[in-house]
Amino acid sequence: MNIAIVTINQENAAIASWLAAQDFSGCTLAHWQIEPQPVVAEQVLDALVEQWQRTPADVVLFPPGTFGDELSTRLAWRLHGASICQVTSLDIPTVSVRKSHWGNALTATLQTEKRPLCLSLARQAGAAKNATLPSGMQQLNIVPGALPDWLVSTEDLKNVTRDPLAEARRVLVVGQGGEADNQEIAMLAEKLGAEVGYSRARVMNGGVDAEKVIGISGHLLAPEVCIVVGASGAAALMAGVRNSKFVVAINHDASAAVFSQADVGVVDDWKVVLEALVTNIHADCQ
């Protein structure tokens, strides 16, 4: 089986980490490197079609993200193939893929006979930053073309800062509360040395930054310690913390699903527990 690995602007870490977990024995891998970063898909779609016609591949694999999703879908349409976006794994013998559905509550196994099969990867937490692509692959460079005529202007946003949540070693995930709780939550998190994230339901209550959402529609994290408080354990939220090394769940409902996904669970009012934890930490430090 011939597989084309598409990377964009030498950002290889996510796709390289995913490849390392797959078994591609018996496959011929090629590396299609798009560089520099295109602004819109139209700059590279024609070139991708031409490249596939010169060196056909059974599977064309794109990196995670909205741009990878778009290229996968539109290239498959142009080549009369099939596209599946945000896959988590690929089984070579059956050419079947797995991906999450229904807010991460279900894992689906999908299969199609159409070729080429264009795939984009699901976002991953904790991808090794120094992961490298397999050696020995044929590399083919794809240079983006001119911007399309319909694109009147573009703006390049400089100095976009990365949210501290993405690199935090300790994270406090809050699922309940309202705007009145924000100051107390921030104080507790600071004393715990943790960054704060929120469930989507909590963000919808207002008063917190929507960029702090944890889960499939927000951050996917892999901290050393994650404390989840006041959250039932919905699959969409827990997808954002499932790669944590150690998970503590605090909830007053002993039957909450969050406890089945935690290393340690405490059934109590979460504010009381966090305040006691802060007190004990500071007592031990004295």
Swiss-Prot record:
GO MF annotations in UniProt: electron transfer activity; flavin adenine dinucleotide binding
What InterPro entries does this protein map onto? Answer: DHS-like_NAD/FAD-binding_dom, ETF_a/b_N, ETF_a/FixB, ETF_asu_C, Rossmann-like_a/b/a_fold
Where FAD binds, per the record, is at: 225-253
Q: Which Pfam families match?
A: ETF, ETF_alpha
The protein's UniProt keywords, in alphabetical order, are: Electron transport, FAD, Flavoprotein, Transport
One biological process term from GO is: fatty acid beta-oxidation using acyl-CoA dehydrogenase
Q: How does it assemble?
A: YgcQ and YgcR form a heterodimer.
Sorted alphabetically, which PANTHER family does this protein's record hold?
Answer: ELECTRON TRANSFER FLAVOPROTEIN ALPHA, PROTEIN FIXB-RELATED
Protein purpose: May play a role in a redox process.
Q: Which family does it belong to?
A: Belongs to the ETF alpha-subunit/FixB family.
Name the chain's protein: Putative electron transfer flavoprotein subunit YgcQ
Q: Which organism is it from?
A: Escherichia coli (strain K12)
Q: What lineage does UniProt assign to this protein's organism?
A: Bacteria, Pseudomonadati, Pseudomonadota, Gammaproteobacteria, Enterobacterales
